[in-house]
Each structure stands twice: as C-alpha cells, then as structure tokens.
From Swiss-Prot:
Ranges of biased composition (kind: Basic residues): 34-50, 109-191
Gene name in the database record: rsrc2
Coiled coil residues, start to end: 204-244
Organism listed in the record: Xenopus tropicalis (Western clawed frog)
Disulfide pairings: none
Protein name: Arginine/serine-rich coiled-coil protein 2
Length: 409
C-alpha cells in the first residue's frame, strides 16, 4: 500500500495544488506513525524476549550439563536473530519508498523540514543508533554469556555479579576482625582457668610410670613369698602324713598331727586314712599300691587280691600240685569203658593208664563205688522211661504198669 501511494504522488508532481500538498502531507504523517508503530512493536518484542531470557537464567539450575547449556545458547541466538530480520525487512521497505519518492524532490525536502520540526527525523536516527547499539550489545552479551558458561564449572564465584566482589572485600575485612577478636577471647579463657604448664605433664607421666612399676614389683614379691610359704606348708604336711602312716592307725596319725600343732583339714584326714589302709594291706598280702595310683581312688585290699589272681593265671603249673577235685574227676568210672573214654576226652584228661594203675585209697575207693552204683541206676531208669514213652504208647494212660515197673526197679 505504501509503494502504490508513492507512485501516485510521483506520477503527477506538477498538477497538485497547495490543498493537495496539504493532503499529501497528512498522508505522509499517517504513513510515518505506521512505521514508528511497527518499530515500537519489534522493540517491545525484543524487550520481552530479553526479560524472558533473564528470568530463565535466574531460574536455571546450576546442575545442568554443558551440552544442555550449549543447546539453549544456540536456540536463544536463533530467536534473537528473528526480530532483527523483521527489522531489516522494514528498513528495506522504507528505503524503497524513499527511492520511489525521490522524483519529487521538493515534496521530500518539505517532508524533511516538517519531520525535523516535529522531531521525527531525530527519533528515526536515534532509533537506528539504538538498533545498531542493541545488536552489538546483544552480541557482546551472548559472547560474555558463553564465556561465563564455560567458566562456571571451574569456579562459580567468578561468574557472579560485581556486588559479590564487593561482599568479598567486606567479608575479608570481617574475617580479619574475627581473627583479631578470637585470640583475645582465648586469652581471657586462659586467664580465667590457668591449667598446669605442659612442661610438667611429661615429668608427671614418667613419675607415674615409675610408681606403677614399683607397685608391680612389690606385688610380685608378695605373691612369690606367699607361694613359697604355701609350698613349705605342703611339704611339712606331707612329711607329717608319712610319719603318721609309718607309726600306726589313722587315729594315732591324727593325734600326732594335732600334737605337732598343724591344723587338721579334711583332706589331711583322708590322706591319713588311706595311708593306714595301704600299710594294713601291705602287712597282710605283701603287695603295696604303686605311687602312680591315686591313693584316694584305689582300695589297697582289692588291688592286692587282683595282683594275686594275675600271678596265679600267668604262673606256670607244677607237676606235684594237684587238688582233690582234680583227682576225683580223673578217677571217675561210669561202669563202661566207652563212657569213661568219652568223659576224659571232654574234660581234657590225658593220663588214662596212670588213673587205672594208680594206687587208690580206701576212702576214694568207696566214693568211686558209690558213683558207679548211681550211674547204673540212672541208666536203668532212663531205659525204662524210653521204652514207655516211645514203644508202648497204645497201652492206656501208662500210669499203672509203668509205675509198678518203676517200683520194682
């Protein structure tokens, strides 16, 4: 629409009257605020964009990675260039309008004068300067922001504002003041409660160690003396027990101990009794309990009997020693030679000829005769019982005849 208006103005520069000139001036005045309005819109957009970016920076977390930050920088730079492109397009359109309107130099001169009188040309030049300044300033800002983002992971304190630097200087001065104040407080506390000097601490510990060693040595000496006394008392008790055992019974031993002045404990009494039993067993059997046995756990009389049995078992037999029972079993006669031979084989008797030809006493002869009669009667009864039970089973109950037969026998 702006280009068509300029063409109409350029087509008839001479025919216009002063009324038409006024009308054209009013149209130019109507055109110029459009451009100004358009420029103000782009400016407001850029300002809003800057505010948004500042808010985003404030609310951005420090824990983002480098890649995410680079991506955001690229997006922001692309968004910044978009309003600049729209401004360039508006500027090119205005240049074209001026070129088209250059045919009418007088009108252009009048317009310039009017605009200068109203302050439009000054505002346009100022707006252009501001645009150039804003572009250069934005570029510098983008560069400084990229540098700050690179430097952030190294030290966050560098990327902070100038007020922080001022606060640092203030904090340093405060720290100096605190350092100056601290030793004063410490000195006050020391003056209130004065501790012992450190030089005497080492001496005290050394003295304590020496005293502890001396105490340990004294305790060890006392323990050794007590042990020696106990050993001496035990030896005396053993000697007295041995003397009492050699002298006689337990009553005498206890009396001897009481007479000697030693305290009679139950252990000493038990030892005295066992010593008396050992002496008695030795006097009767001639066998003493060896020293490796506990006298309180071993009965000396039973031990002596066991030793006798062992000697009898492991001692060799003598030829002349034969007991009466052995002679009776050897001379036993069942009235039948076959039975006698079987019996001697079972009993392990070997000297058959000696038993037959040996001289027999009168008493032994009588016993042998009685044994023969007993064995004969037993054989006869066995035969009768066998015949009745095995061969005569069909003969009634078997009480009358069998009992009569037994009576006759």
């Amino acid at each position: 629409m702006a280009s068509s208006d300029t063409e109409r103005d350029g087509g008839s520069p001479e025919k216009h009257s002063p009324v038409t000139d006024k009308h054209l001036e009013h149209s130019d005045l109507a055109k110029s605020p459009r451009g100004l309005k358009h420029y103000s819109k782009s400016r407001s957009r850029s300002r809003e964009h800057k505010r948004k970016t500042d808010e985003c920076r404030k609310h951005r977390s420090r824990s983002r990675s480098k890649e995410a930050r680079r991506h955001e920088v690229k997006e922001k730079s692309s968004k910044k260039h978009r309003p600049d492109d729209s401004i360039d397009r508006d500027h090119s359109d205005k240049v074209r309008e001026r070129l088209n309107s250059s045919e009418n130099g007088e009108e252009r001169h009048r317009r310039k004068e009017k605009r200068s009188s109203r302050g439009r040309s000054y505002s346009k030049s100022r707006s252009r300067e501001r645009r150039h300044r804003s572009r250069s300033h934005d570029r510098r800002k983008s560069r400084s922001r990229s540098k700050e983002r690179k430097r952030r992971p190294r030290s966050r304190s560098r990327s902070r504002s100038k007020h922080r630097h001022r606060s640092k200087s203030r904090s340093r001065s405060r720290e100096k003041k605190k350092r100056i104040e601290k030793p004063r407080r410490h000195s006050r506390s020391r003056s209130r409660t004065p501790p012992s000097p450190p030089a005497f601490r080492g001496r005290n510990t050394a003295m304590d160690a020496q005293e502890a060693l001396a105490r340990r040595l004294e305790r060890a000496k006392k323990l050794q003396e007590q042990r020696e006394k106990e050993m001496a008392d035990k030896q005396k008790q053993q000697e007295t027990v041995a003397v009492a055992a050699a002298g006689g019974g337990s009553v005498i031993n206890v009396a001897a101990l009481l007479a000697s002045g030693t305290q009679v404990t139950p252990q000493i009494a038990m030892a005295a009794q066992m010593a008396a039993l050992q002496a008695k067993a030795l006097a009767e059997t001639g066998i003493s309990v060896p020293s490796y046995y506990n006298p309180a756990a071993v009965n000396p009389m039973r031990f002596a009997e066991q030793e006798k049995k062992r000697k009898m078992l492991w001692q060799g037999k003598k030829e002349g020693d034969k007991s009466q029972s052995a002679e009776i079993w050897e001379k036993l006669n069942f009235g039948n030679k076959d039975q006698n031979v079987k019996f001697r084989k079972l009993m392990g008797i070997k000297n058959e000829e000696e038993a037959a030809t040996s001289s027999v006493d009168v008493e032994s002869f009588k016993t042998l005769k009685q044994q023969e009669e007993v064995f004969r009667n037993l054989d006869a009864q066995y035969e009768m019982a066998r015949s009745q039970t095995h061969t005569q089973r069909g003969m009634g109950l078997g009480f009358t005849s069998s009992m009569r037969g037994m009576d006759t026998v």
